[in-house]
C-alpha cells in the first residue's frame, strides 16, 4: 500500500519514517517533505499545491493512496480532511470544524468552559483599547495569546503591565502574527510543570500515546521567547497513573463528547498541552495534530504499526486495537538556526555524520537538498533523537548525535530532559 504524508517538518519526517517501517507499505510520498525525507528508503518527496485540494485528491486517486496523514495544523483548519474524505480518500486528521479547537484560542476557551474542562481564567478581545483597559483589572504575570495559528509562537508571558502593553501593541498594531492576531485571549498565568498528552481519537474512542514533555522556551532554564519547541522527552514522569486517568476523565473524554454534541466528532491526533500542579491539571491549549518535537521521541518508542493505528481510527475500529511501546526512554534535541524564533538566515551548508549509533535517529526539519548537498531552510533544522534504558542514557545519546551535526549559526538548548532526571 501507499501512504501520503502532508508537511515538511521534523514531525512529518518522523511520521513518514514510521509509516515506511510497515511491511505492507511499499511507498510513502511526502508533500513537500525535506532533505531527510528525500534521502530515506521507501520515501519520495512530491511537489503539489497544498492550497489546491483538488490537485491533492487527483494525486491520491492516480497513485491509489491507501492513507493520507496530515501533519501540520494549517491544512486541517482549511478543511483538507473534509475535502479528501468527501472523495472517499482515507484521511487521518480532524474536520475543519473540529480543528477550530486549535485554530481559535477564543473558540477553545469558550468550549472548555461550556463542557467543564479545567483551564485558566481568561478574557477575549478583538479591540486593542478594550484589551488595554482589561490590564488594569488583572494581576501579573499574565499570558497574552494571539487567537489564531502562529506556529507555536503566539503565546507571550508578561511579568508586568508594561510587558503586556508591549505584547498587545505587537499583536494589534505591529500585526506580528498577521490575521492570527486580529483578536487575543488574556489569561491567568499558571504555575506548575507542563506535559504533553497526545492521543489517537475516533469519535468517542481513544488510544492514548506515550506521554511526553516539551521545552517551549528558546533558552536554557525555560527563559526567552516561546518557540515551536526546542526538544522533548518521553515518558513524562509527572504523568503518573493517577494523573493519566485524570487527564482521560477530566480532559479527553469531555472534549470528545463535547465535539460530538457540537456536531463535529473528532478523528485524528488530539494533543492536550497541560499544566500540572499538586495533582491538579489544567489545559493550556489543544493542538489538533501530533506535536513537534514530541512526535520524534514518541514514535521512536512505538513498536506497533502507525499505519494500522491510523486506519483503525478511520474505520472506527479503535476499540479492538492495541498498540505496543518499548519500555525504553527517548529524548529529542532540536538544532535550530541562529536568530530563531525571530529572523534567521537559511541556505547554510550542513555537515552530517556518516553513521549514527544504534537506537538514534536524526530527523530533518528545516532542510533541503541542493546539488546533493543538505542546506538549512528553516528555523528548526533537526531533531536529534535517541532511545536509552533510562532518560539519562537517552539524553546522552541524543546530545552525542547533536555534536556530530554542524552548520553556521547552529544552536540548541543544553538542558533538554533534565526535568525528568531525578
Which functions belong to the PLM regions below?
Residues 1-96:
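ATP-binding N-terminal substructure of ATP-dependent carboxylate-amine bond-forming enzymes
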Residues 4-5, 101-183, 213, 237, ...:
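Active-site nucleotide/adenylate-binding loops and adjacent lid/helix of ATP-dependent enzymes
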Residues 21, 38-39, 92, 114-116, ...:
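Solvent-exposed alpha-helices and their adjacent loops that cap or buttress functional pockets
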Residues 39-41, 55-57, 100-106, 219-220:
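Short, charged, surface-exposed secondary-structure boundary motifs
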Residues 158-295:
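Internal nucleotide-binding/catalytic subdomain
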Residues 248-270, 287-359, 370:
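Active-site "cap" helix and flanking loop/linker of ATP-utilizing ligase/carboxylase catalytic domains
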Residues 367-371, 375-422:
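Generic C-terminus detector
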Amino acid at each position: 500500500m501507499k501512504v501520503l504524508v502532508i508537511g515538511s517538518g521534523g514531525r512529518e519526517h518522523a511520521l513518514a519514517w514510521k509509516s515506511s517501517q510497515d511491511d505492507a507499505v511499499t511507498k510513502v510520498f511526502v508533500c513537500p517533505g525535506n532533505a531527510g525525507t528525500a534521502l530515506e528508503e521507501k520515501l519520495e518527496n512530491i511537489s503539489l499545491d497544498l492550497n489546491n485540494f483538488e490537485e491533492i485528491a487527483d494525486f491520491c486517486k492516480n497513485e491509489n493512496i491507501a492513507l493520507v496523514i496530515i501533519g501540520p495544523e494549517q491544512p486541517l483548519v482549511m478543511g483538507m480532511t473534509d475535502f479528501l474524505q468527501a472523495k472517499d480518500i482515507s484521511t487521518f486528521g480532524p474536520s475543519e470544524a473540529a480543528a477550530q479547537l486549535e485554530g481559535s484560542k477564543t473558540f477553545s476557551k469558550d468550549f472548555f468552559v461550556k463542557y467543564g474542562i479545567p483551564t485558566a481564567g481568561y478574557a477575549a478581545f478583538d479591540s486593542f483599547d478594550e484589551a488595554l483597559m482589561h490590564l488594569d483589572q488583572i494581576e501579573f504575570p499574565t499570558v497574552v495569546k494571539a487567537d489564531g495559528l502562529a506556529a507555536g509562537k503566539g503565546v507571550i508571558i508578561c511579568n508586568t503591565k508594561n510587558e503586556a502593553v508591549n505584547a498587545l501593541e505587537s499583536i494589534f498594531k505591529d500585526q506580528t502574527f498577521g490575521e492570527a492576531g486580529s483578536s487575543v485571549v488574556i489569561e491567568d498565568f499558571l504555575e506548575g510543570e507542563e506535559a504533553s498528552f497526545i492521543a489517537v481519537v475516533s469519535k468517542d474512542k481513544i488510544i492514548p500515546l506515550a506521554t511526553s514533555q516539551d521545552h517551549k522556551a528558546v533558552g536554557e532554564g525555560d527563559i526567552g521567547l516561546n518557540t515551536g519547541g526546542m526538544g522533548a522527552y518521553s515518558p513524562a514522569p509527572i504523568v503518573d497513573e493517577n494523573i493519566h486517568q485524570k487527564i482521560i476523565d477530566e480532559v479527553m473524554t469531555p472534549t470528545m463528547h463535547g465535539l460530538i454534541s457540537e456536531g463535529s466528532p473528532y478523528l485524528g491526533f488530539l494533543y492536550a498541552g497541560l499544566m500540572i500542579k499538586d495533582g491538579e491539571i489544567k489545559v493550556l491549549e489543544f493542538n489538533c495534530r501530533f506535536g513537534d518535537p514530541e512526535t520524534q521521541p514518541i514514535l521512536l518508542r512505538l513498536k506497533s504499526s502507525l499505519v494500522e493505528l491510523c486506519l483503525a481510527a478511520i474505520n472506527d475500529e479503535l476499540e479492538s486495537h492495541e498498540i505496543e511501546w518499548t519500555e525504553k526512554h527517548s529524548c529529542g534535541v532540536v538544532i535550530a538556526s541562529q536568530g530563531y524564533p525571530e529572523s534567521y538566515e537559511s541556505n547554510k551548508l550542513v555537515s552530517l555524520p556518516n553513521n549514527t549509533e544504534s537506537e538514534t535517529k536524526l530527523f530533518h526539519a528545516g532542510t533541503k537538498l541542493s546539488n546533493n548537498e543538505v542546506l538549512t531552510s528553516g528555523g528548526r533544522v533537526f531533531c536529534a533523537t535517541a532511545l536509552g534504558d533510562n532518560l539519562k542514557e537517552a539524553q546522552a545519546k541524543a546530545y552525542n548525535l547533536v555534536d556530530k551535526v554542524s552548520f553556521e549559526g547552529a544552536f540548541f538548548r543544553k538542558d533538554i530532559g533534565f526535568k525528568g532526571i531525578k
